[in-house]
Amino acid sequence: MFTIALPKGALLKDSISTFKRAGLDFSDALEKNNRSLTFESNCKRAKALLVRNGDVPVYVSYGQADLGIVGYDVLRESELKVAKLLDLGFGGCHMSLAVKKNSNYLKPTDLPANCKVASKFIKTARFYFEELNIPVEIVHLTGSVELGPITGMAEAIVDLVATGKTLKENGLIKIDDLFYSTARLIGNPLSMRLDDNHLRDTILSIESTNDT
């Protein structure tokens, strides 16, 4: 039996559907009254751990899970050593730079040197501005980063944007996209090397059904 890390939240339903098409059914994890954090597939070939999206690469990297599904945004920010297996295509959103709508900033280079930029993704934000050679101070927030510009603590934010509705409701606009993030299938490197074809067969099944 091998172990899969499934992300709680927005990616969970599609993640379960992905494995179900490959013959591993963890539908019990979607039951509203179920408080369990571990689930066996109906076929008893695998078990799933229900974890926070940001913890998926941690469990996979440290070997507590052999496979996992995680957003590319989290995977890129974590920089943990995992095998990057498949782009699953769902959960799409942009990592974006946004500012107040009534500001004079139309592009990244309009931001003043050494201004503050709020983000949950501090490594991603720092790398982005270093590549542009724009000196900024990254302010790490774990909640609603939109409050950074609203309160005057920051001139801009770097955050995930799906529909743009939250930005609009808070008087913010995008001025650049860093990258497009989708759900990714990842694996533990050692598990992949020691695999007796159970992981390989699952990955191939996911790949074949994901293309249809």
Curated annotation (Swiss-Prot):
Documented EC number(s): 2.4.2.17
A GO-annotated cellular component: cytoplasm
Keywords: Amino-acid biosynthesis, ATP-binding, Cytoplasm, Glycosyltransferase, Histidine biosynthesis, Nucleotide-binding, Transferase
Subunit structure: Heteromultimer composed of HisG and HisZ subunits.
Family affiliation: Belongs to the ATP phosphoribosyltransferase family. Short subfamily.
PROSITE patterns cross-referenced by the UniProt entry: ATP_P_PHORIBOSYLTR
Principal EC category: transferase
Function comment: Catalyzes the condensation of ATP and 5-phosphoribose 1-diphosphate to form N'-(5'-phosphoribosyl)-ATP (PR-ATP). Has a crucial role in the pathway because the rate of histidine biosynthesis seems to be controlled primarily by regulation of HisG enzymatic activity.
Reaction(s) this enzyme catalyzes, per UniProt: 1-(5-phospho-beta-D-ribosyl)-ATP + diphosphate = 5-phospho-alpha-D-ribose 1-diphosphate + ATP
GO-annotated molecular function: ATP binding; ATP phosphoribosyltransferase activity
InterPro entries: ATP_PRibTrfase_cat, ATP_PRibTrfase_CS, ATP_PRibTrfase_HisG, ATP_PRibTrfase_HisG_short
Gene Ontology biological process terms in this record: L-histidine biosynthetic process
Pathway: Amino-acid biosynthesis; L-histidine biosynthesis; L-histidine from 5-phospho-alpha-D-ribose 1-diphosphate: step 1/9
Subcellular location, principal: cytoplasm
Domain comment as written in the entry: Lacks the C-terminal regulatory region which is replaced by HisZ.
Entry's localization field: Cytoplasm
Name of the protein this chain belongs to: ATP phosphoribosyltransferase
Gene3D superfamilies reported for this sequence: Periplasmic binding protein-like II (3.40.190.10)
